[in-house]
Amino acid sequence: MGNIRGERTVDIDAPIERCFDIAADVDHAPEWQGSLKDVEVLERDGEGRAALVETESDAKVKAVRATLRFTYAPPGQIDWHQERGDVKSLHGWWRFEDLGEGRTRATYGLDADPGRMLGMLLRGPVEATVRDFLLGNAAEGLKQRAEAG
C-alpha cells in the first residue's frame, strides 16, 4: 500500500491572521478538528506555540498516536512532521492565502505512509474513506471556527 495523500481547500470569511492563529493553537485543535482526539504539548517554541506535540487521532479503523514536530511561518504556513508514532511517516501542513476584504483561502494537507501493519487495515475503499475523513474534517472545522468569530 502506498501513501495516503490529499489536500482540502476552503475559502473562509475571516482574516488570514485569525485563521493562522486558530490553526497554530494546537492545544485547542481537538475542539474543532473532529478526527483529533487528544493533544499533549511536550515543548513550546520561543513564541509560546506548540513545537513538539503528542497526538491521538481517530483513523476510523484504529486510534493512531504520533509525536509531531511543528514549524510556523506566519501568517501563511504551518508544517508538521512525525518524529515517532504508529504510522511509518507523516507530514501535514496548512497553507493560508489572503484573498483580501477579510477573506482567506486555507489548504490543509496530509501525506502519510501507514506502514505495513496499519496499511493492511486500510485497503481498497477503506483507504478513500479514511483519507476523506482525515482531510475533510480539518478544513471545514477551521472554517466554522474562524467564521464563528
Which residues does each predicted region cover?
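Hydrophobic beta-strand positions in extracellular immunoglobulin-like domains
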Residues: I12, S57, L110-A112
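Short strand-connecting beta-turns/loops that link adjacent beta-strands
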Residues: P15, G46-E47, P75, L99-R103
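Well-ordered beta-strand positions
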Residues: D11, T71-Y72, E97-D98
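Hydrophobic ligand-binding cavity/cleft-lining segments
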Residues: M1-G48
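Intrinsic-disorder/low-complexity, polar/charged segments enriched in Ser/Thr/Lys/Arg/Asp/Glu/Gln
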Residues: N3-D11, A50-L52, R65, Q77, ...
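Glycine-rich portal/gate segments that line the openings of hydrophobic small-molecule binding cavities
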Residues: P30, E40-V87, G136-G149
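Hydrophobic pocket/interface hotspot
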Residues: C19-A23, A29, V53, F70, ...
